């Protein structure tokens, strides 16, 4: 359908500004459209005819316009050159090859550079409630320096302090994993799917804040971070080494961080019982963030499975492949479990009762993992098998 646009030049003489506006009027028009220039000058016809010939456009006519006591002149031209911009297609499941770094909704000029975004299929990366998750991430921001009253952290006995520092070391390692993995995939997702890079950027910001906070807590009473065990290193390496976004999102956000929020809640209660309310608050704030990350992962996996149920087999393969790798290495981090048992018991003398609490936590983790997997669209029997096959190192 032919459209008409009008550019009011008024007293602008022919020159750089005049022809810039004229160029833009033609640039944004489609082939066959009419462009009308309104000017107070009546001697532009020859210049515009010459410009149209040079540009491959068509000058049609000139006529006068009278408005009260003023006289203006209209110069009518038609665009003969090809349309320069593609029309935005909101229903496309594939990002346009020329999308570049333009946001969703943009019309892209033809012949723009081709960026290679490997993750360019909506059916494989999308999830519901992305905007809501992103909005919540902005509302729930907190400051690790000012929102935690570090001076109010109590002094615990040396055994509890070591257990705390060791646990914070472990938490920090896990958060580095949760920082780097989304960062790797962020640059692979086309801006055509604008909400996803925004959500991932919020996740990355959250993880950076958690890393800062856990290190500060380890340093709060002078011990600092402690030991990084081979078991933890290998478990996180098997997570970090996954190069497929769908598998990685499942292993990290659903299986890993889903288990992690149960761990954070357990630790939060431990510190509440010890009277360390600021550390409990820190863990609560981190858990609140992690809950959003799990929601994103579950929405992503659920959406993808609903589009293609056969992808459940891919997730099954990823879980058992990781399980087989870890079984050939070490099992659990005994140093972490002992630290958790001491913390849960409240002292080294009550480590036995604390260890029972840790065992109950592991049962709860397995039950909650199974529930999350079923919510993603996986049948109960397989969900239970996958949950039981998850790394005993929590993440």
Where are these regions (language model features)?
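An N-terminal amphipathic alpha-helical segment
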Residues: 1-29
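Terminal targeting/low-complexity segments that flank the catalytic cores of oxidoreductases
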Residues: 21, 83-198, 219-225, 231-232, ...
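Short glycine-rich, basic-tinged beta-strand/loop micro-motifs
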Residues: 27-39
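Short, structured protein-protein interaction patches enriched in aromatics and acidic/basic residues
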Residues: 38-58
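Alpha-helical transition-metal enzyme core signature, strongest for iron centers
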Residues: 52, 171-179, 200-218, 253-264, ...
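C-terminal edge-of-domain segments
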Residues: 58-81
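Active-site-proximal alpha-helical scaffolds that flank and shape metal-associated catalytic sites
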Residues: 216-288, 321
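C-terminal helix-coil-helix/basic helical segment that borders enzyme active sites and/or dimer interfaces
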Residues: 299-309
């Amino acid at each position: 359908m032919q459209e008409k646009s009008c550019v009011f030049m008024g007293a602008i003489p022919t020159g750089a500004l005049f022809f810039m506006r004229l160029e833009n009027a033609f640039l944004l028009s489609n082939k066959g459209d009419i462009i009308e220039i309104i000017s107070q000058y009546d001697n532009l016809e020859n210049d515009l005819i010459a410009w149209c010939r040079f540009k491959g456009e068509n000058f049609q006519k000139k006529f006068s316009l009278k408005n009260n006591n003023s006289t203006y002149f209209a110069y009518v031209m038609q665009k003969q050159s090809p349309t320069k911009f593609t029309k935005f297609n909101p229903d496309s499941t594939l990002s346009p090859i020329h999308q570049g770094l333009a946001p969703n909704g943009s019309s892209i000029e033809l012949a723009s550079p081709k960026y290679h975004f490997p993750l360019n299929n909506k059916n494989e990366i999308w999830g519901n409630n992305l905007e809501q998750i992103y909005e919540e991430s902005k509302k729930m921001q907190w400051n690790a320096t000012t929102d935690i009253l570090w001076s109010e952290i109590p002094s615990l006995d040396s055994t509890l302090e070591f257990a705390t520092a060791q646990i914070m070391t472990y938490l920090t390692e896990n958060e580095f994993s949760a920082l780097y993995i989304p960062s790797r995939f962020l640059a692979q997702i086309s801006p055509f799917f604008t909400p996803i890079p925004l959500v991932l950027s919020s996740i990355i910001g959250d993880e950076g804040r958690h890393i800062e906070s856990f290190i500060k807590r380890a340093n709060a009473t002078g011990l600092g971070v402690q030991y990084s065990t081979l078991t933890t290193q290998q478990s996180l390496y098997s997570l970090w080494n996954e190069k497929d976004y769908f598998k990685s999102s499942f292993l990290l956000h659903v299986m890993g961080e889903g288990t992690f929020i149960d761990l954070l809640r357990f630790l939060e209660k431990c510190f509440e019982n010890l009277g360390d309310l600021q550390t409990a608050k820190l863990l609560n704030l981190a858990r609140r963030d992690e809950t959003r990350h799990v929601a994103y992962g579950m929405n992503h996996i659920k959406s993808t499975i609903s589009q293609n149920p056969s992808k459940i087999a891919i997730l099954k393969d990823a879980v058992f492949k990781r399980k087989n790798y870890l079984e050939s290495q070490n099992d659990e981090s005994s140093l972490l479990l002992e630290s958790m048992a001491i913390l849960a018991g409240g002292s080294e003398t009550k480590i036995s009762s604390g260890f029972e609490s840790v065992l109950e936590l592991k049962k709860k983790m397995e039950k909650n993992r199974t529930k999350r997997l079923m919510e993603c669209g996986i049948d109960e029997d397989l969900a239970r098998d996958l949950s039981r096959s998850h790394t005993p190192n929590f993440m």
